[in-house]
Amino acid sequence: MLESVRIEPKMSYRKIVGVNGPLVIMDNIRFLKYAEMVSLTLPDGSVRQGQVLEVSGKKAVIQVFEGTAGIDVKETQVTFTGETMKMGMSEDVLGRIFNGSGRVIDGGPKIIPEDYLDIQGQPLNPYARIYPEEMIQTGISSIDVMNSIARGQKIPIFSASGLPHNEIAAQICRQAGLVKRKDSIDSSDDNFAIVFAAMGVNVETANFFRNSFEASGSIGRTALFLNLANDPTIERIITPRLALTAAEYLAYEREKHVLVIMTDMSSYADALREVSAAREEVPGRRGYPGYMYTDLSTIYERAGRLEGRNGSITQIPILTMPNDDITHPIPDLTGYITEGQIYVDRQMHNRQIYPPINVLPSLSRLMKSAIGEGMTRKDHGDVSNQLYAKYAIGKDAQAMKAVVGEDSLSAEDRISIEFLERFEREFISQRHDELRTVDQSLDIAWDLLKVFPREMLNRIPSDILDEFHSVAPVGVE
């Protein structure tokens, strides 16, 4: 029996035949395995980590996560480990800060792992997935009421350069929690965790997130993975996978409800393009590789819920659209994979509205399963539909006003414009530290809808109007 077992030793070589960007090319290598981890020892004694990206006979193409600067072709020793990249996991990752390669950078002790998990994730049986239900409350009215996020959903934030997507992400991390339900047995804060992955951010942004979480006290339930702008570009390819591996451990082994926020996915896609260019692959749109859709799906599809496990993974990736172009390959392909989007608008930002979320191009495809009686409130869906309708009509009336002038507007158009201005000022706009419950947000919405006569609220059933239309709003803290 033992004769059939072949133990392959760790092999070390000094056979680098070339370095191209973040890639190292080697030849005459035995026992090669695709995606196995590689350790590179430089002449000065420093050690870097890499991964086999391509195997062709005895040739290997290796991507080096810490970059290839300083690698001596003749003197660098390369050791093939025979193992895929794994990360040591423990519940102690919460409250800790890691760099983009998964090393602790907060000055604390190393994590004592309870398990080692492959960063590519475990293959999930599609039949075992549970449809996302039950809402995660972000405390932001425009998201909670009009683009509600379900546990296990993946919904990106489409932003652009210079817009406050970092502030929105930090606010969601600070305020996010499970909607309290009478029949829920796991709605305590102990069962809610946040995994935050930053790719290609500058030091100022990294310190902003770090200080924000520490000041609010939410750092204790948050694991941060920070890849800085001056860190190797190639490292950005593994940062989101490390973060999602931590999320999968917390969700499926520790049965926590995990919110994963990743910023900026545009930096990730640019790193993917850099590796593709170094491999001299045929480029696709805008120079991005043709397999970018498939690659992005290996990240986004790791959200969800599994039958027999109480935990869930909800993803909110953030990406900056180059030149505010929503047809750019990154937001375009992301929109195909994910279940909606939250759109951050530059014009609203210029009008000093925070958060500048434009609800009209925003969408949550799984919203209906997360709201309603027993989950949020029975008027939630109808109020959301009515807000959308009246806001869209108000936008049309505002455009008409710019053409014909205010004096030529009908009484209905003037009411619509009044609603639009109050809606943006009172409902969408809120403070950076303002946490609104779903009930508070819905009460504000009812207060705004009262500017219309009852017969103009044609998206809300009469029984809902009878119950809520005359109720005084609850004050917002």
Swiss-Prot record:
Its main location: membrane. Gene3D superfamilies: 3.40.50.12240. ATP binds at R365. GO terms for biological process: ATP metabolic process; vacuolar acidification. It is found in: Vacuole membrane. One of its GO terms (molecular function) is ATP binding. The keyword Lipid metabolism does not apply. Keywords: ATP-binding, Hydrogen ion transport, Ion transport, Membrane, Nucleotide-binding, Transport, Vacuole. Pfam families: ATP-synt_ab, ATP-synt_ab_N, ATP-synt_VA_C. One of its GO terms (cellular component) is vacuolar proton-transporting V-type ATPase, V1 domain. The keyword Membrane applies. It comes from the Eukaryota. It is a peripheral membrane protein. NCBIfam families: PRK04196.1, V-ATPase_V1_B. V-ATPase is a heteromultimeric enzyme composed of a peripheral catalytic V1 complex (components A to H) attached to an integral membrane V0 proton pore complex (components: a, c, c', c'', d, e, f and VOA1). Belongs to the ATPase alpha/beta chains family. This is V-type proton ATPase subunit B. It comes from Encephalitozoon cuniculi (strain GB-M1) (Microsporidian parasite). The gene is VMA2.
